């Protein structure tokens, strides 16, 4: 678990947010700064449990080949730890039943694998490895109230909700869509960063289920996507630890899957390929659907 880091430069860095972006940023900064402090307003469970500050935690997550390789370089041994905890390898062509553009995609050995797991499992394993570094501290239940610095000149740290100030040579905001950095910067006399907004009218609902997929006969991926523009629905299923599957159903331009069990099943029944609907019928739900 212990990792060696090269000699750091003088100064501290502060990272706001202990999600995947914040954890990865902190790992890189640990090689360049004497001390890195990661702050998150959530409690951070020691076990793979969902938390309020990660709204996507209840939806599917996978590591594609290059992303996994990068994380493995940053956190040696991460892949083996995830697999030992139940993450599932799948060949993206051989182990996938994909209906798209009017037919099934051919299945064959590709040698291209992705690793499927729940977001809480991935985040927990990465955070544990980050916390093993001697110059990194992760502080849970710690809300940031604003930035500190010389107005119009520079940012030199953060102020916490309780009034404590943490000086920093670099502040990284990885707090996600709830970021307040634009307002904090304006309060210090800086212009807010330019913002680009792309409206995507896509909606999706996810249900976690437990059991086997008889159609695949093992871990694999199911995808059913209708042909645009006349049809707007899609569905996907991915295996994760604990003999469970994330099943996501969605649509575009106002077409969305219901969260109740009957409506969710009916939406799956209307997809062009029956594999996802069959998976739902042959498994048991774990908790409620999340939109």
Question: Where does each model-flagged region fall?
Answer:
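N-terminal FAD cofactor-binding segment of flavoenzymes
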Residues: 28, 32, 47-98
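Central beta-strand plus flanking loop segment that forms part of the substrate or channel wall
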Residues: 186-219
